[in-house]
Amino acid sequence: MVRMNVLADALKCINNAEKRGKRQVLLRPCSKVIIKFLTVMMKHGYIGEFEIVDDHRSGKIVVNLTGRLNKCGVISPRFDVPINDIEKWTNNLLPSRQFGYVVLTTSGGIMDHEEARRKHLGGKILGFFF
């Protein structure tokens, strides 16, 4: 079976494993977008370290969970978000201003909404986590 949205599958696996109280989760297939998204999550401490396993096919990622993640999801379709509309999207997606991040793909790479605002970049919205 062909997977339509690998990022959505990966985030749903992380969500389900976190709800079940697992310490680790195995994601496959591996992609650059998933790795960058996980890097943003790890930078903010929502997940632990992750390891990329090369199985000579599409690859696997083993993610260590910390129990801090409440929810993560993907936004499909990937809407264009200018800099002025980032605030509107964060209000819609996140429960509060104090925590949670919206992940954007910009011309400067994949980053959270705060970094995009600092660098004055708009882009396409990938997903969120809190």
Swiss-Prot record:
One GO biological process term: cytoplasmic translation
UniProt GO cellular component terms: cytosolic ribosome; cytosolic small ribosomal subunit
InterPro entries with a match to the protein in the record: Ribosomal_uS8, Ribosomal_uS8_CS, Ribosomal_uS8_sf
Pfam families cross-referenced by the UniProt entry: Ribosomal_S8 (PF00410)
MF (Gene Ontology): structural constituent of ribosome
UniProt keyword list: Ribonucleoprotein, Ribosomal protein
Gene3D superfamilies membership: 3.30.1370.30, 3.30.1490.10
Protein family (similarity comment): Belongs to the universal ribosomal protein uS8 family.
PANTHER family: 40S RIBOSOMAL PROTEIN S15A
NCBIfam families: PRK04034.1 (NF003115)
The protein's name in its UniProt record: Small ribosomal subunit protein uS8A
Organism: Drosophila melanogaster (Fruit fly)
